[in-house]
Amino acid sequence: MPLMSSSFTPGQAQATVNSFQDKGQRQIAQAELYYFSARAEECKDIAELYLQDKDIYLRLSAGLLYSFSNLTLGNPSAAKMGFRNIQECLHQTEQNPPSNEAMASCVFANYLAMVLMHLPTDKLPPLRDFLPYLPTGLRAYGIYVLAHNAYLHEEYANALGLCQSVFLMLDGCYPIAMEYLYCVIIMSLVNQKKENEARDVLMTAWNMAKADGFLEPFIEHHGLMLGQIEACIKPTEPELYKQLSQAVIAFSRGWMNIHNPKLQASVTDKLTPMEFAIAML
């Protein structure tokens, strides 16, 4: 994930993508930009080209981007194929690890896929052990994944502390990782009944994300923010909220197709984003 790994000023995502000299890294970085900008079709088209790449870092990145973009596009079988690709990378690397960095990237990708799908991670190597081998931007995002997992286990103070600690160690601005960290901070504060603080953080994250059009973090965490987007964004930016809402519906349906395959017609699948947010309160 070369773009996620990069430090850049908000608003400079495309320039950062263009700065990569290696063609593979540049194309995967472009796919990242498309994904985080909620342009799933364009992301998928690029990622598909690298699913069997010999470079394990490009292959892992492609697997993640291909899987999650296909969730939004309503292609669960394609999403599952991407996840299997990531698992195969880990199994191959465990048998003959080329480096600590490669192993760390495999563990990171698999842990990320499982946590964001709200699936158990007990059969994976512990991500914490491999964080030192990840580049700074990925390490920050890796801590977001750990914090998200803590949140799912209702460890809200732990999740909040993990996220806040990252901002103390960052040596630059890593917008993608920071926006996801902000999302867990918001979620944790809301569950601690600190809504005013949560809304302040939401506006900080939103203003950072808007500079590059990065709507995806808010799409993925919409329901877990328990109505904060409706409270803060809908009244002031109705057109962006409408765009966000449409993407939330698509992503949520795709997510449920993977997470809950036996409940294809679940109640939440039939709710609008605002109805779902109210139901979560």
Protein language model features and the residues they cover:
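Helix-turn-helix repeat elements of alpha-solenoid scaffolds
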Residues: 1-14, 32-49, 71-89, 112-127, ...
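Tandem amphipathic alpha-helical repeat scaffolds
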Residues: 1-5, 24-39, 60-76, 102-118, ...
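Helix-turn-helix DNA-binding segment
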Residues: 258-281
